[in-house]
Regions:
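Short glycine-/aliphatic-rich beta-strand segments at the starts of folded cytosolic domains
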Residues: 5-28, 90-110
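Compact, charge-rich alpha-helical regulatory domains located at protein termini
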Residues: 9, 24-34, 45, 126-127, ...
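A generic structural motif
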Residues: 13, 55-62, 136-143
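Short, conserved charged micro-motifs
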Residues: 21-28, 65-71, 104-107, 113-115, ...
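N-proximal, solvent-exposed amphipathic alpha-helical segments enriched in charged/polar residues
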Residues: 29-36, 108-124
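Short acidic amphipathic segments
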Residues: 38-56, 119-137
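Surface-exposed beta-loop interaction hotspot
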Residues: 74-102, 169
Length: 170
């Protein structure tokens, strides 16, 4: 699945996918080369670079380029490769109680999770794009094309080691 959205910055388009694009926090292309078919997006006139995230990409446009024309070209290419775009909207982040007493930690990748075991485990769950760990709880945000219906059981199982309480209602 994929979807394209506008950002508040007119020189940026956001691509959302259900495919993991990188394990790095941000992987910039170039110098890296994205896998097919995203590599072909760099051939579209007006796209300067692509920043890959776990389940999405930021398409950075050249100043003065036509975002509407670029959007059309991106959509045409991705429809041929991946089929029609999804209209799914992002589910809100959820909070889960955890036995953590340290300082606030934010991670958007396994790399950012460092050696913190709760954060590392959460990034083993498909769909997780951000986790914010604070004393007593962790906020978990999913990629736009994932739903809590699909992912919640895996998050609970990950946090379900003995001693982990139930979900805190937002």
């Amino acid at each position: 699945m994929w979807a394209l959205s506008k950002a508040s910055n007119p020189t940026v388009l956001r691509l959302h996918t259900s495919l993991e694009l990188t394990q790095a926090t941000i992987e910039t292309c170039p110098p890296s080369t994205p896998r097919h078919p995203l590599d072909r997006l760099l051939e579209i006139p007006g796209i300067r670079s692509i920043d890959l995230h776990r389940y999405g990409a930021r398409l950075n446009l050249l100043p003065g380029s036509d975002p509407h024309a670029i959007t059309r070209e991106v959509c045409e290419l991705l429809v041929k490769e991946w089929g029609g775009a999804s209209s799914k909207r992002a589910d809100p982040a959820r909070t889960f109680a955890v036995p953590y007493r340290g300082s606030r930690l934010v991670a958007e990748s396994l790399q950012m999770a460092g050696s913190q075991p709760i954060l590392r485990e959460l990034f083993g769950v498909p769909g997780v794009v951000e986790a914010i760990l604070e004393p007593g709880h962790v906020w978990v945000r999913l990629g736009r094309l994932f739903s809590w219906t699909e992912v919640e059981e895996d998050v609970r199982r990950t946090l379900g080691a003995p001693g982990y309480p139930e979900t805190i209602k937002p």
